[in-house]
Structures are given as structure tokens and as C-alpha cells.
């Protein structure tokens, strides 16, 4: 069976959408990973089909090495397949799309590819630059120099590209930063301006970046597991498709891409102009970040540690348990969403929460609870504590589900102690399964030192630990007593009974 290519697809009589190979290169993309290809490039591909934008993407590998990737994907005409697999509106989704939006992949650490990148920089066709260079990518490296070919850091590469474009008298571009850090576009622009200062470049160039370019902060949300790891399943998929594709990527159906900017972007971005679901332009992505953190991430952190203690191992199984699913939904709809009403449309939040349940019930992803439990103390502080405090401030009452989640979090760290070693706290849950709780060292040391302490004292010491929470949680009226009582139920009757009580 042949690898995917334009010729291979023609041979098998492929009838789907394909952008011609010679379409103009309108996008320069820093990053070539599964996320960009399955999420961002799929948006461009569908935007091309819907609007006739007719733009190809040049992928740039942002770090040295891995030359085999560029050579491999170029050998198959930069075509690849995205499988969308999961649950949507309660229905199982398993569909494929050939992505034809990419023209080539270059690695600027090869001299010819560096020159090719700079040729794209001054192209009249270039309109948009996209990046996802991981959380570590938007960082300042003082060793970068203006004449490096290329500089090591991504912001230095990008400012070098933009300076070359400005010097050639070309118009500005839109920059869409997709890295998973807060205010990604603003931070990227700040670091680029630092290089302009370091390198003594012209004030006129800084003004061009500020006035002629649009550097956007964006917020992305989808799960991209990447590739199919089971060889038998991969072979079955290839048989179904009619070709081999070593660069196939898998993702879930849910997609959300919030782009911070003005109304003009709606006409300039083909996927927004097409009205594709899940992508939108907004003056401020901050409320949507809050929605994601408090609903999606907050739900995980609230029910997962307790569900592990109850004997569950993967997220999907939790969604098939009426008590756990009910606990999560009661928390989201009765406790979390009401606190978001000042910033967000409540009906949108409810739709987002409904999508969360579908995402957690994905039949194609075995999402291990224990992996989600990493650093749960800091996660609960960032994701769930603000909602608890907002709820108390707005209603004068304790949110029962969120308060119970604190009790089950304590239970997660205080199962039978096996040992405190290295970077973990080794514990044994009731069914005999041994596990390692991983968190900040001070958290693990605290719980190891409290092994055998009675629960009333334990809860008091946890809630008054300002290193954990940044404040004394016993100052929240009634919380200490509630958590002591909920933890007593967990110890005597199990987590599921505590979850059930919180819903009554």
C-alpha cells in the first residue's frame, strides 16, 4: 500500500476536497507537531474549502534536529490525515479528513531551508504567521544575535523574519500565537521588542510591528492524543483509508479557538469568515480562559482524586457511573456556572459543560486518573478554590460538591502510607492497588508527617497551611466542619457516598 500523496489519492479515486499543490503560500507556521496539524491546519483546510481562500501553509521546525520529519512529510506532498474520534452531542464520532493546506516543511537549521524561510518572509502572498512552540517556546534567550542563521529562540527567529519583511517594504501580517501560556501574543511581542532593543534595530521597525502587524493572543482547547499506538488498529485504519500515512494525527471532536482582536480579523481569517464551529474573534479571551479553567479543568480536579480512591482508573469509566457523573454535573451546573454569570453567557457555559461530559466519555481515549492527579494541590487552589470563594461570597453558603472535593483530595493523599521516597508519596488504596502521589515536595512531606494523625487535626492542619492555599481556609465560615464530616463519610462509607451526599 502506498503512502498518501496527490498521485496515490488519484489512483484510489479519492473524492474529498484537495487544495491544488501550486496554491500560493499565505501562512508561515512555526511548529509542525500533532496539535498544529490536527487543529490549526485543519481549520485552514476547512476555511480554504468553504471560502476559496486558496492559501497554503509553510511549516517551520522551530528547533534543530528531527530533519527526518520534514523530509518524510515533504515526500508525501505534505498531505496527511486527521482522524476525529470521540463523543459529540452524545453520539460517537469517528471520521477522517485529508488535510491539503500545507505546501512544505522546512528546517531553518539547514542553510537552504533558512534561505527558504526568508524568501517566504518577503513574499507578497504571506498574510498570516502561526505558532505553537510549546509553553517553553515563548522565552527570551539573551545569547541570540541578529545575524544568527537562525537564532535559537522562537521569538528571535520571528522578529528576524519580520525585520526582513519590513526591510523589503512589505505589508504587515497577522500573528496567531497558540502556545499554552497566558497572554501568549502579548508576551511574544514583548520579547520581540526586547530583541529589537538588544540588537539596536530601528524604531521605525518597532512602530511597523505595533501598527502594521497584528500579534494576537489566542486561547486553544482540544485534546490531540496524536497517533494510533496499536499496530493492528493502525493497519485497519490504513486499510479503510486505502493508503498508509505515517503522519496521521488523531484528535477529539471538541474544538475551541478564541482569537483576541478587533472585528476586522473576521474577514481576514478564512476559518472565521467561513463561520466554522468553535473558532471566534473576541476583544478579550480572558473570560473564556476562566470558563475553561473553572469548568473543564475544575471538574477534573474536583472528581478525579476521589474517583481514584473509590477504585476507578480512567475518566471514561467515571462518566459511566451515575453517582460520579451526577456529582460532577451538580457541581458544574449548581456551583460553578452561577459564579461565571457576570463575565460569560450562562447558556454558553451550560453548552460548554455539556461538551465536557462528552469529552470525558470519549471511547477512544483511556485517560488515566492517576496522571490527572499530578500536582493536585496547586490545581485545586487554582481551579476550584476561586469558585468556592466566589460561591460563598455570592450566596452566603458553602458549595457542597466543591467542599466535598477538598475532603476527597485529602483522602487521596492519606490512604495507607507505604513510603515517602524521592519525588513521590507511595500509598495503597482500599482495593490493594499501590500508587504514587506526586506533588510539590512540601505537600508530600506534610502528608507523610501526618500519617496516623486523627482526621479532625489533619483537616485543621491542611486548611490552615497557607503554603498550600495562599491563605487560611478555616476563615471560610463552616468549611472546616464540613470537610471533617465529609472526610468521615469517605473513611466509613466510601467516596461515592460522600459524592452522593453532596448532591442531596
Language-model-detected regions and their locations in the chain:
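Substrate/ligand-engaging "lid" and interaction regions
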Residues: 1-504
Amino acid at each position: 500500500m502506498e503512502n498518501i500523496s496527490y498521485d496515490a489519492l488519484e489512483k484510489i479515486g479519492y473524492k474529498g476536497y484537495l487544495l491544488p499543490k501550486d496554491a500560493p503560500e499565505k501562512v508561515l507556521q512555526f511548529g509542525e507537531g500533532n496539535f498544529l496539524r490536527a487543529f490549526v491546519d485543519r481549520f485552514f483546510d476547512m476555511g480554504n474549502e468553504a471560502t476559496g481562500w486558496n492559501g497554503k501553509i509553510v511549516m517551520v521546525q522551530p528547533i534543530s534536529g528531527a530533519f527526518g520529519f520534514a523530509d518524510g512529510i515533504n515526500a508525501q506532498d505534505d498531505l496527511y490525515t486527521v482522524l476525529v474520534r470521540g463523543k459529540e452531542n452524545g453520539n460517537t464520532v469517528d471520521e477522517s479528513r485529508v488535510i491539503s493546506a500545507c505546501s512544505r516543511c522546512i528546517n531553518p537549521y539547514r542553510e537552504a531551508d533558512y534561505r527558504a524561510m526568508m524568501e517566504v518572509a518577503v513574499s507578497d502572498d504571506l498574510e498570516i504567521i502561526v505558532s505553537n512552540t510549546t509553553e517553553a517556546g515563548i522565552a527570551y534567550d539573551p545569547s541570540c544575535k541578529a545575524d544568527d542563521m537562525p537564532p535559537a529562540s522562537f521569538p528571535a527567529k520571528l522578529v528576524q523574519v519580520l525585520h526582513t519583511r519590513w526591510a523589503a517594504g512589505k505589508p504587515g501580517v497577522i500573528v496567531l500565537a497558540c502556545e499554552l501560556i497566558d497572554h501568549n501574543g502579548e508576551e511574544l511581542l514583548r520579547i520581540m521588542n526586547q530583541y529589537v532593543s538588544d540588537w539596536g534595530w530601528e524604531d521605525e521597525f518597532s512602530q511597523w510591528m505595533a501598527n502594521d502587524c497584528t500579534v494576537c493572543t489566542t486561547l486553544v482547547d482540544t485534546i490531540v492524543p496524536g497517533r494510533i499506538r496499536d499496530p493492528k488498529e493502525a493497519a485497519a485504519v490504513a486499510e479503510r483509508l486505502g493508503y498508509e500515512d505515517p503522519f496521521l494525527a488523531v484528535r477529539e471532536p471538541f474544538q475551541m479557538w478564541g482569537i483576541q482582536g478587533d472585528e476586522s480579523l473576521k474577514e481576514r481569517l478564512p476559518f472565521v469568515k467561513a463561520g466554522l464551529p468553535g473558532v471566534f474573534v473576541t476583544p478579550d479571551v480572558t473570560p473564556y480562559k476562566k470558563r475553561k479553567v473553572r469548568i473543564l479543568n475544575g471538574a477534573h480536579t474536583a472528581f478525579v482524586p476521589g474517583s481514584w480512591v473509590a477504585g476507578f482508573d480512567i475518566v471514561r469509566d467515571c462518566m459511566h457511573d451515575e453517582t460520579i457523573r451526577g456529582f460532577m454535573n451538580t457541581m458544574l451546573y449548581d456551583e460553578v456556572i452561577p459564579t461565571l454569570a457576570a463575565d460569560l453567557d450562562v447558556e454558553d457555559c451550560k453548552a460548554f459543560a455539556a461538551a465536557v461530559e462528552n469529552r470525558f466519555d470519549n471511547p477512544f481515549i483511556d485517560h488515566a486518573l492517576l496522571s490527572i492527579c499530578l500536582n493536585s494541590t496547586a490545581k485545586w487552589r487554582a481551579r476550584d478554590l476561586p469558585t468556592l470563594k466566589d460561591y460563598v461570597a455570592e450566596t452566603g453558603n458553602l458549595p457542597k460538591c466543591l467542599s466535598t472535593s477538598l475532603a476527597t483530595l485529602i483522602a487521596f493523599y492519606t490512604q495507607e502510607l507505604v513510603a515517602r521516597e524521592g519525588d513521590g508519596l507511595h500509598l495503597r488504596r482500599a482495593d490493594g492497588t499501590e500508587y504514587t502521589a506526586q506533588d510539590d515536595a512540601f505537600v508530600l512531606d506534610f502528608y507523610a508527617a501526618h500519617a496516623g494523625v486523627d482526621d479532625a487535626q489533619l483537616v485543621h492542619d491542611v486548611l490552615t497551611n497557607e503554603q498550600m492555599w495562599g491563605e487560611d481556609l478555616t476563615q471560610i465560615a463552616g468549611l472546616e466542619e464540613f470537610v471533617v464530616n465529609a472526610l468521615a463519610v469517605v473513611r466509613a462509607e466510601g467516596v461515592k457516598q460522600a459524592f452522593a451526599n453532596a448532591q442531596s
